[in-house]
């Protein structure tokens, strides 16, 4: 078949028969001529055989796939297969090679391609895979050039060619978070590939905001395909292709063509995710066949013809709603698929016969295949199938958030401000390691000058400079965005404050330096998130482990077989991003560092204010609420009936309970203040005690930093006029909760009393700041949550799978009982404000009428008692489908609501509210039906029962089922080939009980023993109709609901935006950038540094930073959200 003729034909795809395995007794009929029986009856002399020669290295020609396929090709009546021996290929001249009519030859390491080309020229056989094109496939530059010429989508790339004799002379500029190659800028994360396709050492570089470092990919060695490295600088020798990193949610698709009309696709876990190769019980890498969409079939057709390779493998990346080709591998076969072996042999045999039969006068007609009939599983009885899981989750345990302000006038600060383009907007946010290192160097230099000369003209406050230095030196490394410095230009200095005399006030320009630190996820928070991820698996079909040997294997199987459409979104705060990554690690049983998981699995969701609140300031409604709240809590008398009415018109039992405990708010604040004074004096005493000199507190904090933290609260809580600043109550509660939980080994006195009182005050202040009356709660909640509500509505509506999702191919799937099933999971990780707001919407937005709905009334009674939405609070929405109901019936789709108030508090919280347990109406354990199957394997039905999403519908199940219960130990059993269980079965163990080991609070790596356990999920409602929920969400999201009816997935929205916005990463991690000593030369700089000559912007501006860099800087800042007491906690 000539190439010109091929190109004119439209792509036409076929697959083989439905029988996924054909035993040798049966498959002769597929390969022999249709009229074989009649032919055999004639006694005419036998026709000449067509000889197919296999010319490749022995490792390839003797591999299992090749043997399987050749065995099948040999069954064609007129075809004989001859395999060239490696000895002959390497050592004999081509004239001595065996003769053949058709040549299948391909390059691999050590193969003499030149000789194969010479042989083809000498003997002129029909060549299956063009040999000259195989030279080009060995160079990625040529591959990319051909792909581009064919109009096939590629990641944005640039080529860096280096002269090996002079590697330094090349067009590469490397920055901290980007490289510039031939004028093309690539922000991290980006990919660096050697130009030689035979070199598999591909590196992916991560941005400093995600922890920096790189993932080093290589040819599989045992169970590893990549390893994480702290090295952040690109390679300095060799030629490379640099390309934009594509966020594929941790999945690669490998496509295998056999001729232009046939392509088999398999998905596997991306080697860049955690570098762990998933293998089955036979030690083979786990891959699952997936369905290509029409665009991808066209790509396969183009690749096959452009490279003139009948048998050809290439890699697809599915990202941003598009499919990109990132590698063409040439001749390669699928491993371990009987169906593919049959199809491949049949197609190759037909190609050979079609081309050569006429020359050999062999009668041949191509057998026609019936179209594949799609497999449509049917169900009987009232069965429900899980279709969608949506969860909104608060971040995990974090360090207390802290802030220090100081006015600076030294020229060095102005120089830094100008260097970083601060004059453009009058504000500057510094959080990159290099920037923080510069601020630290300035602080060290000024302190050294102050130490050497007390009469120095340096105006900066010495104690504040020392605090700046101490905080920046904390942990010995800069890590993501756990610290940041903001500088604001003040043309006339700081405005006068009440304690400042007018005549002392300076009119000269100054900079307001605000140092923020803390608020980062603790090691305990990471454990919490990972454990919750593990527990979360148990909500999916097969989750209880009854048939599986370990809990949650239902989800792992669903996910690994690419029937799970998972997207994880997080707001742009480091603690939230890291919580999301740790949760994903537990949910999907991943291993290794969080940075690669973060970059590939977690999407930033601050577009449209989805999880971040847009406004910097409080809304007018919040201002009114805050003022009223502060007024009530400033009265020095016991709460009156009128106060109860004013503070809790909604009748919240948790708030009433706290008011009973407090009685007189001012007297309680007095007690809290005196307890803080007692605490600071105890810490001072410890600091003076030589035995406590080197004491290390939790997460590298020192006694000095702990004292500063509490001293600042002591100073800020009670104002100069003797009144209390109520907005500091959440901070006090935050700090004491942290110390009781993590620094209990100090055994400070009265900490539990301070915890109890500050919690009672916080239990009033925090929830009531989101509104006192129901109308206010709803108004404030809408301000925070409307974009999120719209997105949730769109998630529930999109019950039809789109073609960009990885779908399992039903015909090729062995041992997967329900290949058509697809479950969508959307996880939204955010801060406290969104969780409070979403819960307010559910409670007060009129979803159900509690006077008519008994189940909703019970749920509202339970929520009334919940006093805190702690770390890892979850609101979970689950959508089920009943395939037996008519598509237009309201009963077709069914929604459930579940809720957990998150982590349990400290020891004394014995009276946690308890609901009615986790009672999904569609419990698979209830009334489970036995499956009748025709499968020959007797154990299959039991094994695959795990894999069913069909569950019996029962409105109420009385027994509470906690997803955090301790699971039984896995029972011993043979794991079948298709189950995805890594040989390091680290998640086969019983989940770690999230801790109540209080006996020895300091034991364990990073104090694992202090990770608080998480309250189990409670069912709020398990019998809602989708229409009812949709109408409710539409009413909340109005007036612009209709515009967002077709909200696309965030990934596709990102595609349409500029390339710079395609992947916005603003993350945090524990991969350190080491803090450097200040260079001696800088310390010797003259003391004549002038005080403050910078009256305005200088003419010499720093180079213009790229818009991408600017967007990262501006968006990732934790802008003092809401200047309020409880926001973004």
From Swiss-Prot:
Location of region: Polyphosphoinositide-binding domain: 377-448
Entry GO terms, CC: cytosol
Enzyme Commission (EC) number: 2.7.4.24
Primary location: cytoplasm
Binding site for ATP: 140, 193, 200, 219, 243-246, 252-254, 270, 315, 327-329
UniProtKB keywords: ATP-binding, Cytoplasm, Hearing, Kinase, Nucleotide-binding, Phosphoprotein, Transferase
Positions with biased composition (Basic and acidic residues): 921-945
Subcellular location: Cytoplasm, Cytosol
GO biological process: inositol metabolic process; sensory perception of sound
Modified residues (Phosphoserine): 44, 229, 1051, 1058, 1066, 1106-1107
UniProt cross-references to CDD domains, sorted A to Z: HP_HAP_like
Cited function: Bifunctional inositol kinase that acts in concert with the IP6K kinases IP6K1, IP6K2 and IP6K3 to synthesize the diphosphate group-containing inositol pyrophosphates diphosphoinositol pentakisphosphate, PP-InsP5, and bis-diphosphoinositol tetrakisphosphate, (PP)2-InsP4. PP-InsP5 and (PP)2-InsP4, also respectively called InsP7 and InsP8, regulate a variety of cellular processes, including apoptosis, vesicle trafficking, cytoskeletal dynamics, exocytosis, insulin signaling and neutrophil activation.
Entry similarity comment: Belongs to the histidine acid phosphatase family. VIP1 subfamily.
Entry remark concerning the domains of this protein: The C-terminal acid phosphatase-like domain binds PtdIns(3,4,5)P3 and InsP6. Despite its similarity with the phosphatase domain of histidine acid phosphatases, it has no phosphatase activity.
Record's protein name: Inositol hexakisphosphate and diphosphoinositol-pentakisphosphate kinase 2
Organism for this UniProt entry: Mus musculus (Mouse)
């Amino acid at each position: 078949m000539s190439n010109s003729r091929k190109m004119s034909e439209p792509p036409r795809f076929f697959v083989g028969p439905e029988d996924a395995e054909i035993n040798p007794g049966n498959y002769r009929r597929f390969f022999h001529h249709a009229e074989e029986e009649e032919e055999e009856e004639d006694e005419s002399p036998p026709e000449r055989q067509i000889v197919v020669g296999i010319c490749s290295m022995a490792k390839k020609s003797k591999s299992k796939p090749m043997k399987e396929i050749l065995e099948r090709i040999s069954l064609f009546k007129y075809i004989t297969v001859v395999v060239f021996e490696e000895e002959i290929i390497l050592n004999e001249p081509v004239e001595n090679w065996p003769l053949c009519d058709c040549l299948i030859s391909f390059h691999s390491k050590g193969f003499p391609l030149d000789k194969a080309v010479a042989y083809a020229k000498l003997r002129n056989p029909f060549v299956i895979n063009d040999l000259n094109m195989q030279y080009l496939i060995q160079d990625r530059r040529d591959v990319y050039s051909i792909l581009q010429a064919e109009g096939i989508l590629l990641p944005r790339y640039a080529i860096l060619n280096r002269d090996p004799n002079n590697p330094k002379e090349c067009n590469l500029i490397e920055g901290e978070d980007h490289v510039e190659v031939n004028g093309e800028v690539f922000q991290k994360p980006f990919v660096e590939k050697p130009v030689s396709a035979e070199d598999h050492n591909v590196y992916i570089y991560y941005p400093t905001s995600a922890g920096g470092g790189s993932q080093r990919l290589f040819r599989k060695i045992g169970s590893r395909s990549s390893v994480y490295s702290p090295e952040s600088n690109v390679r300095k020798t060799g030629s490379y292709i640099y390309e934009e990193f594509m966020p594929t949610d941790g999945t690669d698709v490998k496509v295998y063509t056999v001729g232009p009309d046939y392509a088999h696709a398999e998905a596997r876990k991306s080697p860049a995710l955690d570098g762990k190769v998933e293998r089955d019980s036979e030690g083979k890498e786990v891959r699952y066949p997936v369905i290509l969409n029409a665009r991808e079939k066209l790509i396969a057709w183009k690749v096959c013809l452009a490279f003139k390779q009948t048998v050809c493998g290439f890699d697809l990346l599915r990202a941003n709603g598009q499919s990109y080709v990132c590698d063409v591998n040439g001749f390669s076969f699928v491993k371990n698929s009987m169906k593919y072996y049959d199809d491949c042999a049949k197609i190759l045999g037909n190609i050979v016969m079609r081309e050569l039969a006429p020359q050999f006068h062999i009668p041949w007609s191509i057998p026609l295949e019936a179209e594949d009939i799609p497999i449509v599983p049917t169900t009987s009885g009232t069965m429900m199938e899980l279709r969608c899981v949506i969860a909104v989750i608060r971040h995990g345990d974090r360090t207390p958030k802290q802030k220090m302000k100081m006015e600076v006038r030294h020229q060095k600060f102005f120089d830094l401000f100008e260097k970083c383009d601060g004059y453009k907007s009058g504000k500057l946010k510094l959080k990159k390691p290099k920037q923080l290192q510069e601020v630290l160097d300035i602080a060290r230099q000024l302190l050294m000058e102050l130490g050497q000369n007390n009469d120095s003209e340096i105006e900066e406050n010495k104690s504040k400079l020392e605090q700046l230095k101490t905080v920046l030196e904390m942990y010995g490394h800069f890590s993501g965005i756990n610290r940041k410095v903001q500088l604001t230009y003040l043309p006339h200095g700081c405005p006068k404050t009440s304690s400042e005399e007018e005549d002392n006030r300076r009119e000269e320009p100054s900079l307001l330096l605000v140092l923020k630190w803390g608020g980062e996820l603790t090691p305990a928070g990471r454990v919490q998130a990972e454990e919750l991820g593990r527990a979360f698996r148990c909500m999916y079909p097969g989750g209880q482990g009854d048939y599986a040997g370990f809990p949650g294997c239902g989800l792992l199987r669903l996910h690994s077989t690419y029937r799970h459409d998972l997207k994880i979104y997080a707001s742009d705060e480091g603690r939230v991003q890291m919580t999301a990554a740790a949760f994903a690690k537990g949910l999907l049983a991943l291993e290794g560092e969080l940075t690669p998981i973060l970059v590939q699995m977690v999407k930033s969701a601050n577009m449209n204010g989805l999880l971040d609140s847009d406004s910097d300031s409080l809304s007018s409604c919040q201002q009114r609420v805050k003022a009223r709240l502060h007024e009530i809590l400033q009265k020095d008398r016991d709460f009156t009936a009128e106060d109860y009415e004013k503070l809790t018109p909604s009748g919240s039992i948790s708030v009433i309970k706290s008011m009973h405990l407090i009685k007189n708010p001012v007297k309680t604040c007095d007690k809290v203040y005196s307890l803080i004074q007692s605490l600071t004096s105890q810490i001072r005493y410890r600091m003076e005690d030589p035995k406590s000199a080197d004491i290390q507190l939790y997460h590298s904090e020192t006694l000095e930093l702990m004292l500063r933290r509490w001293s600042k609260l002591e100073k800020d809580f009670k104002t100069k006029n003797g009144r209390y600043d109520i907005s500091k109550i959440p901070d006090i509660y935050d700090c004491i909760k942290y110390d009781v939980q993590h620094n209990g080994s100090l055994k400070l006195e009265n900490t539990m009393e301070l915890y109890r009182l500050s919690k009672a005050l916080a239990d009033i202040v925090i929830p009531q700041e989101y509104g006192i009356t129901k109308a206010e709660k709803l108004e404030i909640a809408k301000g925070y949550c409307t974009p999120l509500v719209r997105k949730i509505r769109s998630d529930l509506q999109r019950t039809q799978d789109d073609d960009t999702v990885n779908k399992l191919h039903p015909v090729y799937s062995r041992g997967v009982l329900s290949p058509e099933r697809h479950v969508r999971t959307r996880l939204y990780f955010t801060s406290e404000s969104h969780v409070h707001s979403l819960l307010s919407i559910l409670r007060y937005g009129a979803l159900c009428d509690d006077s008519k709905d008994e189940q909703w009334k019970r749920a509202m009674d339970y929520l009334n008692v919940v006093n805190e939405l702690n770390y890892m609070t979850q609101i979970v929405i689950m959508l089920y489908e009943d395939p037996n109901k008519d598509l237009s019936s309201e009963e077709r789709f069914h929604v459930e609501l579940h809720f957990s108030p998150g982590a349990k508090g400290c020891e004394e919280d014995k009276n946690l509210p308890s609901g009615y347990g986790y009672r999904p109406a569609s419990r698979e354990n209830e009334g489970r039906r036995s499956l009748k199957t025709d499968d020959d394997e007797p154990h299959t039905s039991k094994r695959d029962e795990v894999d069913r999403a069909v569950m019996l519908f029962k409105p109420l199940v009385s027994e509470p089922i906690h997803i955090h219960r301790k699971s039984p130990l896995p029972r011993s059993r043979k794991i079948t080939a298709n189950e995805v269980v890594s040989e390091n079965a680290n998640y086969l163990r019983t989940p770690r009980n999230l801790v109540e080991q209080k006996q020895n609070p300091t034991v364990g790596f990073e104090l694992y023993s202090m990770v608080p356990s998480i309250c189990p999920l409670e069912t709020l409602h398990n019998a809602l109709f989708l229409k009812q929920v949709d109408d409710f969400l539409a009413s909340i999201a109005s007036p612009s609901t209709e515009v967002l009816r077709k909200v696309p997935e965030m990934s596709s929205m990102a595609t349409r935006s500029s390339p710079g916005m395609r992947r916005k990463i603003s993350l945090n991690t524990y991969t350190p950038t080491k803090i450097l000593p200040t260079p001696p030369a800088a310390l010797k700089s003259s003391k004549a540094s002038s005080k403050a000559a910078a009256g305005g912007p200088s003419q010499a501006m720093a180079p213009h930073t790229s818009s991408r860099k600017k967007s990262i800087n501006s968006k990732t800042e934790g802008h003092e959200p809401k200047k309020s007491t409880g926001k973004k906690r």
